[in-house]
Amino acid sequence: MLFGLVSRHYVEFSQDTLISGGKFKGCTASAGQIACVEAQADGAYLLPVWRGEMHLTDEIGAYHPFADWETAEPGDIIGGFTTFYGKQQGHGKAAAREHNISEGVKRIDGVAVEREETFSFNALCAPYRHSNDYELAPNVSTDGFGYGGGVCQVTTTLYNAALTLPLQIEEWALHSKQGAVYVPQFFDAAVGNYSDFTFVNLLPYGVQIHASAQNGVLTVLFCRAEEDSQ
């Protein structure tokens, strides 16, 4: 099974497209949304979905390679990753889980990380409490629920996007040996009030994070920042 640990292309959907794969029951990406994909030697494209994969056709959208980070110009997309979510993860609280995903995405979208700067997810998103606009939703814990449940899917997507670039992971934790169903085993990234996800930007320029979550499609992209710190 091929899963996009290094996604070198992305697709911008030109039409509504049903996404399914692995044990994921499906969602529908809308025209204009972006997902990170794997380009094959034969010219085909694979979309990693929940430890499975979906073969994509040329008709569903336009495919673009990520810019090489060594030669990228300001504004170029240099890396990214996509995961998928749906009602089957909600255990009766799907709307709350989706709210928390949207809350996490909102807080990291547009954030710039200068060269040699350390990014901290919790600095932007914690604490995971009702008073910080999070809702009670399923998570990986003793009782299976907690405020902010679902935010770890944002962290996991960000983590896998970071793995495609010279970004040094400083702090990272797994949920458990089984991991999260929406990525390969050992490629999830857990956060909580006492655990963070951090990385250092080792690129020779600043980067900007672009994150979006809509219709069950969660994508995190890294772009070369428009203005570099000297």
Language-model-detected regions and their locations in the chain:
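Well-ordered beta-sheet/strand-loop patches within structured domains
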Residues: 3-8, 12-19, 25, 29, ...
